[in-house]
Amino acid sequence: MSKLGVLLTICLLLFPLTALPLDGDQPADQRAERTQAEKHSLPDPRMGCCPFPCKTSCTTLCCG
């Protein structure tokens, strides 16, 4: 039984589990996550607009 433990220890030292590629490391996943993050980081053109009914200071983008 101790031989199996020694063999397992040697194998884990030579080939650690962190060397295996994970699903999150795939380039396609990273590109999709980056694209999704860019979509959410765009400003909303309606944010900060005045409430309805529009006052004279409103822009046509918000009120029109």
UniProtKB/Swiss-Prot annotation:
As given in the record, the signal peptide range reads: 1-19
- What's the main place this protein lives? secreted
Q: Which residues form the propeptide?
A: 20-46
At which residues is Cysteine amide found? 63
Which domain of life does the protein's organism represent?
Eukaryota
Gene Ontology cellular component list: extracellular region
Localized where? Secreted
| InterPro entries the record matches | Conotoxin
Keywords (alphabetical) are:
Amidation, Disulfide bond, Secreted, Signal, Toxin
Secreted as a keyword of this entry, yes or no, is yes
Q: What is known of its domains?
A: The cysteine framework is III (CC-C-C-CC).
State the family it belongs to: Belongs to the conotoxin M superfamily.
Q: What is this protein called?
A: Conotoxin Mr3.5
Organism, scientific name: Conus marmoreus (Marble cone)
